[in-house]
Design a protein with these regions (language model features):
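Short intrinsically disordered terminal tails
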Residues: 1-3, 93-96
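An N-terminal amphipathic alpha-helical segment
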Residues: 1-44
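Feature targets compositionally biased, intrinsically disordered low-complexity regions
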Residues: 18, 23, 63, 79-83, ...
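Acidic, low-complexity, intrinsically disordered interaction modules
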Residues: 31-89
Length: 96
């Protein structure tokens, strides 16, 4: 039976695999459909994002977890000189 990974373990796994490809902090958001679950988000470098997502999702699958890993980006705002970031998101983590 597959299970969901907890937030502390997902941070350790991602930091061990990604190493220097992550910059900044990780963030935890409440899941929109289930308030008991969290989505963990990391800032990542764009050129490594897809490769990291595939590697992390494969690692979680092998370990028996069913969490989905996504890569998302924010739109760049030229006027405000902000945005344009790339994020690695691990959805549906158990708080822990």
């Amino acid at each position: 039976m597959q299970k969901l990974i907890n937030t502390k373990l997902v941070r350790k796994i991602v930091r061990a695999i990604a190493g220097d490809n992550i910059y900044g902090q990780s963030y935890t958001d409440i899941n929109v459909t289930n308030n008991d679950l969290r989505n963990v988000t990391f800032f990542v470098y764009e050129h490594k994002a897809q490769e990291l997502a595939k590697e992390i999702e494969a690692m979680l699958f092998i370990a028996g977890y069913k969490n989905k890993v996504k890569v998302t980006t924010s739109k760049y705002n030229e006027m405000g000189r902000c945005g344009g970031n790339t994020y690695l998101r691990i959805n549906n983590c158990v708080l822990g």
